[in-house]
Amino acid sequence: MPSPQTDTPGPELQSPKEAEEPQTPAQGSRRTSSRKEPNAHRKDGTRLGLGSLRQAFSRASQRALTQVSKEDTGLFRRSSCSLFRSFRQALNDGPATGHSQATPEVPSGVMNGVSQQASTGAASEELKPEAEGKSVADLITERQLLAAFEQLLRLETLLVAEKASRTFEQDPTAFARRAMDVCLLYDGLAAEIGAIVRETLDSDGVDAAALAELARVVSAEEEAHPSPPDDGDFLRTPRRWRQHWEEAVRRSAQERVRRPGAGWAFGEAEGASGLAQLLAELGGLVRRDLQKVRQEVQPAYAAAGFPAWEVYLRAFHSAVAQRLQELARDARGCEQLYILLDWAANVYGSPDFLGAPGLALPAEPLPPLLAPDVWARLESDYTSFLEAKIASCFDSILQLEQSHWAAAEVPEVLQGLYQAPLSMDVHMLVAEHVKAAGAISAELEATTLRICTRALGLFVPRFEKAFLASEAVSEPHLGAYINACEELRTSLLSRFPGTQEELEKPLVTATCSFQKHLLQGLQRELQPLFRVVCTRDWLTQDWLHPLMDKVVTFAGHLQRVARPRAQETLQEVHRFVVREYLARALRPRERFRGMERMHGSQKMSLDAQAISDTFQGLGSEATWLDQAIQCVAEILGETYKDDIQRHLETLIRSYPDIRRDHILAILALRRLGRQRNQHLLQHTQDLLRAAAGAAGAEAPRGRVLFEEIKVPSAMAVLITCV
């Protein structure tokens, strides 16, 4: 008798000839068997088998069977293939000696006392299993998963028993149809498990009862199918629903992680801001989902001992890592690269990311969010872009300073010191980038510091050259930039000791250059005033007062310069005044005799005292300069000639850099005569040799005075003639 056709939307069971080409539920094809049924039992079995298929496909939950992913489709296909391998084995197996025909026992914890039935008549009654009037498909649709599994397990156990009793020897196709029913219903249950997992995070609330039942049915299946049967039969094979549940969790996490910025692409107008917004949305979604898992989902699974928190956490971590690595492949520019690195290290990697201290990580550490080679490439690309960005920032700082020069803006005075924006801009630039890099990794911090240091070392000479070539050179600006260089040198070197080698030299060089130009401006103003020294006009004029006024005015600017550099500059001014005075005195334009010489000595002594008092009042610490002019004045006006030797000894001991030519020039002012000059020179010869040694080895640094005073080489001839 030909098999009856059916109008059910699901596929019909295949004949044994078609077993090698199993049809999956997704195909939805209908075939009519051309084989004739040998008996009424087979006809009844065919009818009931198709009814079970109709239940599995038309009455099962649409959520479970219409939303099946590619992985679920593969599950159906693998189930069917395994089924027919088992079916072929059943056809080929004959009666064997010692073959057990006992009915497999159902675990008591699963069935709760359900009896086994092995008769052929009972099989016909059980092909459409029901519990309280509901089929397995109805129970799956209503998500009574545990009840559905218990009924399905009864059917499976009964079918195994019938197979063992050789019930289907004459009708193997009936076994195939009933086994397919079991297979499809198991897969329907698995699909419903996946649907429940997908809906868990999508809905506003959590169906705790559904999750608890899901966990119980997975545990029940594991207890019912602890290991594959020895004969390799598809029936009673472990369904691995726990792995299926974990895979569903992973797919759910991947789907949700891909939602933020689904249509966003690199290169859009918003650039880094778009990426930052995408990552902010991603972080917010992951945080909310994991909080929901911890607070609502995990408690529902906890009764069955399911490690839902660890599984969800690892699933989201893996999904975020995959999404971030995809973004990393297309990231361009310093800002985008930093945003990715910063988000991975400081946002997602923060212990406060989940927003609650109770959200603990699993005992085993999570794998790196970004693979080491990807992280290294991002850091390398970031530093490459950073070099160009830092150089561009220094160019902008120079342009900003040049705009201040062009506008003739006077530097501000803050806390009593000239202040230039240069120092603050450089500090902010270096500190900002180094701090940002340090928040990501110590290695990136060190690399960024080297980049900033190298760029600053190249910038300082460029800035110095540009400023000195401008028309803005003035005492306030020079003082402001001396302060800026000094502040950069002290603060940066103290904060980043590793920068000393690269920054010390350019900053000190620039500071000295600015000091030199500051002094040169004053020297150009004072130089003409020294021409009157040791002239007859000098004896009658108050020439020193205007000179000291200029010095005092200049010192007013130095009060707004950082003290170490201000003191150095003031001492240089002090030394310049004394040196220029002595240079004019030792090369007089006019020579005094008699009373004019005495008046000149008194005038020189008064000038020495006035110079000393003025610089002492200004705060100069170069007191070693005070005796130079005074000693020359005393030699010039000494009436007791034998005491001249004592004054020379004091002069030589106080100023080790004095030389024989300077002694000759001083003696020429006094006009002592050739014999006495020879005597004094011989007496001071040993002192001069000792002074020369001290000047070369032990003289304090910076105490140079007479060495820079040039006297005429013909002075010795003049003295000899006298």
From Swiss-Prot:
Top-level division of the source organism's lineage: Eukaryota
Phosphoserine found at: S52, S513
GO MF term list: SNARE binding
Biased composition (Basic and acidic residues): 34-46
Any Gene Ontology CC annotation: exocyst
Lineage: Eukaryota, Metazoa, Chordata, Craniata, Vertebrata
Gene name for this UniProt entry: EXOC3L4
One of the GO biological process terms: exocyst localization
Ranges of biased composition (kind: Polar residues): 113-122
Disulfide bonds: none
Pfam families: Sec6
Keywords: Phosphoprotein
Family statement drawn from the similarity comment of this UniProt entry: Belongs to the SEC6 family.
Region (Disordered): 1-53, 92-131
Keyword Phosphoprotein part of the UniProt annotation: yes
Record carries keyword Phosphoprotein: yes
Name this protein carries in UniProt: Exocyst complex component 3-like protein 4
Gene3D superfamilies listed in its UniProt record: Exocyst complex component Sec6, C-terminal domain
